[in-house]
UniProtKB/Swiss-Prot annotation:
The keyword tRNA processing does not apply. Belongs to the aconitase/IPM isomerase family. LeuC type 1 subfamily. InterPro entries: 3-IsopropMal_deHydase_lsu (IPR004430), Acnase/IPM_dHydase_lsu_aba_1/3 (IPR015931), Acoase/IPM_deHydtase_lsu_aba (IPR001030), Aconitase_4Fe-4S_BS (IPR018136), Aconitase_4Fe-4S_dom (IPR036008), IPM_dehydratase_rel_enz (IPR050067), IPMI_cat (IPR033941). It comes from Prochlorococcus marinus (strain SARG / CCMP1375 / SS120). It is an enzyme of class 4 (lyase). Binds 1 [4Fe-4S] cluster per subunit. Its cofactor is [4Fe-4S] cluster. Its EC number is 4.2.1.33. Gene3D superfamilies: Aconitase, domain 3. Heterodimer of LeuC and LeuD. The gene is leuC. This is 3-isopropylmalate dehydratase large subunit.
Amino acid sequence: MSSETLYDKIWDLHRVAEIPGGSTQLFVGLHLIHEVTSPQAFSALNEKGLSVHCPERTIATVDHIVPTTSQNRPFPDSLAEQMLRTLELNCLKHSIKFFKIGSGNQGIVHVIAPETGLTQPGMTIACGDSHTSTHGAFGSIAFGIGTSQVRDVLASQTLAMKKLKVKRIWFDGYLQKGVFAKDLILHVIQKLGVKDGVGYAYEFAGPAIDGLSMEERMTICNMAIEGGARCGYINPDKTTFNYLKGRPYSPKGKEWEKAILWWESLASSKSAIYDDEVRFNASLIAPTVTWGITPGQSIAIDASIPTPESLDKNDQQIALEAYKYMDLKPGSSIEGIPIDVCFIGSCTNGRLSDLEKAAEIAKNRQVAKGVKAFVVPGSEKVAQDAESQGLDTIFEKAGFEWRKPGCSMCLAMNPDKLERNQISASSSNRNFKGRQGSAQGRTLLMSPAMVAAAAVTGSITDVRKLLH
């Protein structure tokens, strides 16, 4: 009986050659590119007179720098316009499929690839973006890469990588009402730390994971990188197959039946050997909010901000830095902290089900006075589906702004930015200093439903109090 994990199986299937020094040349099945990390890579190709090795395995979109109010061209920001134009020209020159604004397929790269069926089990996927691990939710091995590696994949369709160890994170029980996938992954990162996963791939498994939708699973894998892991994945199952069936790039007819048989064979063997394993009880997890300046600095909504003495010595210095930057007192409650801005969106939580959960809280309520709240769908398809359900109307009646697709305030490489020392409740993935556009801006990460709760109450609020 095989003792291989899914990671082992996919690695072996995509191994091209061994490289002196311990690295492996790995074939990349799908390469996703965008406007920020691709220009220099294309320039390097052009300088050497090289062409893209597998344009049919390369897909482009624009997401990081696009404005979310009006997306009429040219963009007011000349640099953003130049970056988009450069991507358009590079895609045209190298015959790369480009999901442009208005195509119906444009959006955040980690939202559009799954929803179009491009992301499939058994693939190796690379993208010049940290949160490429999102695609591991489908039983693929997905890596974020740097610009020089984007160049390498464009030129050779391969990457030089060292094989990771595999850590299984098992979840017994099930999430309680008002607790979501975002709470689960924030809880894991808080317990294990932001460096626990260095050198590892995380395999997420157990009854709690089995019970999640694909969109919830994507949230989990999206933030594996925040725990230090190079990638995170979930074994493919019926939930995976049901999600993929009928999508534009999914296999059709007899090929679909063949694909399912193959995908099922990729799941980690029952006798698989892991390098490490840890267990959690999902039923004990509460709505979770970050209080500091790393995704690992989080607490349950009904808990108090930790005191330095209660922390491990290795965590005390960053905690002292966080208290000062966030202007929060150790021992104080996270609930009740006033909020200036509420952002719902990102590759972590900008999908239809995320917006549905937030809309449930916003419905028949009003955004609190003095709070700016806005919703940014993760893609044009998400926006279209949400609008067909009337979610845009629910949000707008409540006082939220309904925006156009893009990365938006997750990273503030576009007009959506915090000002001065504003505090934001955000459904994104990083709360680093200055992450949302202001050197003094403060970010508290939470689920979309929790963001909506903060918007209508004006402060951090336990969403369970607002559920019908």
